[in-house]
């Protein structure tokens, strides 16, 4: 197994270039199922989740050429409508193939994502919406088996769901008639999907709001144009926290500050200043790192994917911080590992109380998921001594060239084999 060895540091400096957003690239790659032409997507991050999705599309018969952060996708060769478990189990986002496959072919089978219990994660919202559009859906031996010709309808999502919104937007693109979606996710990644589909000829109104009207093409495939994936706001937020936890001056390049409003607001509350240019953000050191109160919520609120990183940062604050995780259960699995480094954190349900200002010590820690693993790296930067972070395959799912980017900021970080 591979692990990272990270030496605690007092200071970072330099520039880091932000990659394309994994969570935007995934649905955009899947949307090529709706295309009549070859689709070229630029600024695609070279991370494990992208490779998994490309493997899935190739397994369905698509021809994909992925190099130098550009993906060339031809789905005219699709000859399979079964998304198999051995690939889908690696990544929940594979469920995104359900809507477009059903819309294009009138039938498909998609394995339930690994460990995904219906009702706990909102995949049930995907299925209910497709049923409202006329799909016949059954769960058979761990697969969603769907069939039917989709027709537009009015659909209200009971809860805001990013992947659910994306799935149904893609399904509605080829459906017959108008689909009205209410309580749609407004994340930048959802907005870009809508804009790309609009550029491909889809009539869609309300982009960027929680109400969309989509006028389906009744089975006619779309003519895609070449486009680039938006910058990764979570990667950007993670590097901002790396600069903050070491109280350093660093600059992020190729970043969209508008997508980071909630993160920047909390950094400002903690005493940090930022200089924002057209596509860069410079973080300036704080005179004093202040405690903060954070409640996660849907965009444009504070992102749940930044909660773990800010928990690590709060350990350096002079006082007590509160983090209220409102979106997901089991999102505090990094706490037990931070405690091994000397953190003072108490949990009460979905609320974490973090007492900052205590010295962190290096330790061997284990990553439990993608964002938790980045929190452990941040804590290791601020700890005294050399830490080892195990199970870093979680990091490889979502962070491109992580060691090289940290080394460019002056971090002593090494990938080693056990």
UniProtKB/Swiss-Prot annotation:
It is found in: Cytoplasm. One of its GO terms (molecular function) is UDP-N-acetylglucosamine 1-carboxyvinyltransferase activity. The lineage of its organism: Bacteria, Pseudomonadati, Campylobacterota, Epsilonproteobacteria, Campylobacterales. The gene is murA. Belongs to the EPSP synthase family. MurA subfamily. This is UDP-N-acetylglucosamine 1-carboxyvinyltransferase. It comes from the Bacteria. NCBIfam families: murA, PRK09369.1. It catalyses: phosphoenolpyruvate + UDP-N-acetyl-alpha-D-glucosamine = UDP-N-acetyl-3-O-(1-carboxyvinyl)-alpha-D-glucosamine + phosphate. UDP-N-acetyl-alpha-D-glucosamine binds at residues 92, 121-125, 305, 327. Gene3D superfamilies: Enolpyruvate transferase domain (3.65.10.10).
